[in-house]
Every structure is written in C-alpha cells, then in structure tokens.
Amino acid sequence: MMSCFQKKSIATAEKLAEIKIVPVLVLNSVEEGLKVGEILVSEGLLAAEITFRTVAAESVIKAMSEKFPELYIGAGTVLNTDDLKRAFDAGAKFAVAPGFNPTVVKSAIENSYSFAPGICTPSEVEQAYELGCKFLKFFPAEAAGGISMLKSVIAPYKHLGIRFMPTGGVSEANANDYLSIPEVAAVGGTWLGKPTDIVEENWDAIREKVRQAVFNSRK
C-alpha cells in the first residue's frame, strides 16, 4: 500500500510531466519573484522551482503562491529539515534537493511532503527507493554523464515506476532529448531565468526564453 508521501510524490511527477519544463530560479526579492511569476503565467509555463540559495526564498514562495495560485511552485536546494518545513509552510507544492540526505527524506515522509532527493548513481537510486521515493532529481545531469548516463541509471529500475527530473546543464538545446526518455517527468532549467538576467532586470530576454521553451516543449 502506498504511503501519503509516495502518493504526493507521484502526483507531483504527473503534474510536472504535463508542464515538462521547470524553471530553476535564484531570486533575491519578492519583487523579482512576482515579476518572473507574471512572465511565467502570461507565457503559459506554470511551474517554478525557487531555490533556497537566498534569504528571500521563503518569502518569495509565499508571495508567488498567493499571487499566482495557478503556478505549481516548488522549493529547490532544500538541504535540511528546517528549510523543508519552511518551504511547505510558505506554500510550496513540492521540494527537491541536489543530493540524497536520508534525514531530509525521512522528515518528508513523516510530514507527507512531496520531496525528490537528488541522485546520480545506482546506489543512490536504491537508497532512495528503499525509503519509499518514487520521484528523483538527477543532478548534476550533464556533468554526471548526461542522457547516456541517465539511461544507464534508469535501466535496472524501469520496472519500479520511478520518475526522474534531470537538472544541471539542461538547456534549450538538449531539453527535448531528456524529455524523450519515458521515465523523465520533466526537466529543470536555469537557462530560463539566469541570475544575471534577473538581477539586471532583463525581463524581455527572460520572456523570450520562456516563450521559446513552451514552444519547443510542444513539438
């Protein structure tokens, strides 16, 4: 029988599979978050991963969740149980991490949070699966060997129904190649909202990248 944690994680994978591309965002203020949120909603890309790499992350998640309820907002770079709780208290629908931390996974299970730990080896897949994880972040995707490595990691576990979200080096050029893998639910991408573009308020550049990503994902 599936746990509530597993059901929520599978639901997240299925929801993100509809959206396909998840912008990975480093935001320094609520104002930045609301502007990027407006762009995402207007262009029809209804997901975002707000990374806990800045002190503003929690308030950004809260503000964006309230302003744009249609956005499926998650928290990224969740490295400890405190950030995990803060993310969901702020309104995050899911959370992901770059690595596999059993303590954080167990906290997610206990609290029925939708959480995808990061993996890049078969050993990590097995450890995550043993704890009940059904949705995993493959990170750092390109540096770890890219599409061929991900396919090799997936191969022994196809029968388990695990879904993956590759992130790290995913770009406009290779996103659809990753998405062509049946076990890949979605890809995470920093190219859609580069920190420099956000800080310099290059909103038109971000809008064009988002628009192109939506177009490409529908091919």
Residue ranges and their predicted role:
Residues 36, 80-90, 123-131, 154, ...:
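Catalytic cores of alpha/beta
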Residues 98-104, 137-146, 183-203:
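Glycine-rich phosphate-binding active-site loops on the catalytic face of alpha/beta enzymes
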Residues 41-46, 67-70, 89-95, 109-116, ...:
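Glycine-enriched alpha-helix->loop->beta-strand junction motifs that scaffold or abut catalytic
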Residues 127, 143, 147-171:
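Shared catalytic-loop signature of beta/alpha-barrel
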Residues 47-50, 74, 95, 137-138, ...:
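Short catalytic-loop micro-motif centered on adjacent basic/acidic residues
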Residues 1-90, 110, 180, 200-218:
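Conserved N-terminal beta1-alpha1 strand-loop-helix module at the mouth
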Residues 26-29, 75-81, 97-101, 117-122, ...:
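Glycine-rich beta-to-alpha transition loops that act as phosphate-gripper elements at the mouths
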Residues 103-105, 109-144:
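Histidine/lysine/aspartate-rich catalytic loop segments that bind and position anionic ligands
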